[in-house]
């Protein structure tokens, strides 16, 4: 991984040590090149790259699709429950190092079922790792994402296959999402499967307004009726939409280094996060696919603080937003925010 490094300022150091939540992380996107090669060897999978360095050199993306092509190739090494456990535990270690005390994690079952790996195998491995993480003080939820470049019929079949798992793991597997290639695949394409998930009382999220237009965010809100919008950075192009997001407190799970790496913005100083924050939108900072985009949660905070010249109060608000927007009980939310406040305002609020 080519890590984005910024010399920590006192605010960055305070942020690094602060308890945080991550709300936009694709577990398959945390698969580092070293682990890809280790799993390939363990499982006898032939990779298109002859070395870790050659694979890392291929991480030169021009847009979302060029990233997705290599992302799916990397996931090909995941075959057995232990593989999903190992991948998830590696992410957990990164969270613990970054003081991420709560994470809501996406996984893409269709990436695996099309290779003959049952959803139950995927979830069992991830769940076992997340149960171990809880013993170390990190809580988590799991969100099943549909691949939007595939058909809604495929998504509906995936949802039906996963129904027993939503019951078996109801403490953890609490929602559905929508990811993969955004262009040409509007949220409206998945209205039926989201209605089924909503009828079960599941939480709903969707990627919208990363490469897609503001109209995709409206569709996510009005047709899918999402609880959170993933990315959403192009909402700034529609003032009425920004006002609606701010008034409704529907959070945006923003991923700054991902946006930079995928050329959503050609420079982090041009990122819309601060403008959205200034207008009252509940923005959060997340890593997306950290193994591919050069940074886990703290690296995203450091780069964003530096590029957008965020101040103490703004960073506190962003971190607090991550807890406010999380899918936990009100009691858990209060506990999480209390931990943040104890760190951020050790002598009490000013």
UniProtKB/Swiss-Prot annotation:
This protein's UniProt keywords: Hydrolase, Metal-binding, Nucleotide metabolism, Zinc
The cofactor remark states:
Binds 1 zinc ion per subunit.
Q: In terms of domain of life, where is this protein from?
A: Bacteria
The record lists Zn(2+) as bound by: 24, 26, 207, 288
- UniProt KW Nuclease keyword: no
Root EC class: hydrolase
EC numbers, comma separated = 3.5.4.2
Q: Which GO terms describe its molecular function?
A: adenine deaminase activity; zinc ion binding
The question of whether Zinc is a record keyword is answered with yes
Q: Where is this site: Important for catalytic activity?
A: 231
User: Which reaction(s) does its UniProt entry say it catalyses?
Assistant: adenine + H2O + H(+) = hypoxanthine + NH4(+)
Which cofactors, by name?
Zn(2+)
Family recorded in the similarity comment? Belongs to the metallo-dependent hydrolases superfamily. Adenosine and AMP deaminases family. Adenine deaminase type 2 subfamily.
> According to its UniProt entry, what is the function of this protein?
Catalyzes the hydrolytic deamination of adenine to hypoxanthine. Plays an important role in the purine salvage pathway and in nitrogen catabolism.
* Designated name of the protein: Adenine deaminase
Q: Write down the species.
A: Paraburkholderia phytofirmans (strain DSM 17436 / LMG 22146 / PsJN) (Burkholderia phytofirmans)
């Amino acid at each position: 991984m080519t890590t984005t490094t910024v010399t920590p300022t006192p605010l960055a150091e305070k942020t690094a040590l602060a308890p945080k939540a991550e709300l936009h992380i694709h577990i398959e996107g945390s698969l580092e090149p070293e682990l890809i090669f280790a799993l390939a060897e363990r499982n006898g999978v032939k990779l298109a790259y002859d070395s870790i360095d050659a694979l890392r050199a291929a991480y030169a993306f021009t847009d979302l699709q060029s990233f997705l092509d290599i992302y799916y190739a990397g996931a090909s090494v995941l075959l057995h429950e232990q593989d999903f456990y190992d991948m998830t535990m590696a992410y957990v270690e990164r969270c613990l190092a970054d003081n991420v005390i709560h994470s809501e994690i996406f996984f893409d079952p269709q990436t695996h079922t099309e290779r003959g790996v049952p959803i139950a195998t995927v979830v069992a491995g991830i769940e076992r790792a997340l149960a171990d993480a809880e013993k170390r003080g990190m809580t988590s939820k799991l969100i099943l994402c549909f691949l939007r470049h595939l058909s809604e019929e495929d998504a509906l079949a995936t949802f039906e296959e996963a129904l027993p798992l939503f019951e078996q793991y109801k403490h953890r597997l609490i929602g559905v999402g929508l990811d993969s290639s955004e262009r040409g695949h509007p949220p409206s394409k998945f209205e039926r499967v989201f209605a089924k998930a909503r009828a079960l009382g599941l939480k709903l999220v969707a990627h919208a307004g990363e490469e897609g237009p503001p109209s995709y965010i409206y569709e996510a809100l009005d047709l899918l009726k999402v609880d959170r919008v993933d990315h959403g950075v192009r909402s700034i192009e529609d003032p009425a939409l920004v006002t609606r997001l701010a008034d409704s407190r529907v959070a945006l799970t923003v991923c700054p280094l991902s946006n930079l790496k995928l050329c959503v913005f050609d420079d982090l100083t041009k990122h819309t996060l601060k403008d959205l924050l200034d207008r009252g939108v509940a923005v959060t900072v997340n890593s997306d696919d950290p193994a591919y985009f050069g940074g886990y949660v703290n690296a995203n905070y450091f780069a964003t603080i530096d590029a957008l010249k965020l101040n103490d109060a703004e960073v506190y608000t962003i971190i607090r937003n991550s807890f406010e927007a999380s899918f936990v009980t009100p009691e858990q939310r209060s506990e999480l925010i209390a931990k943040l406040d104890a760190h951020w305002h050790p002598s009490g609020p000013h």
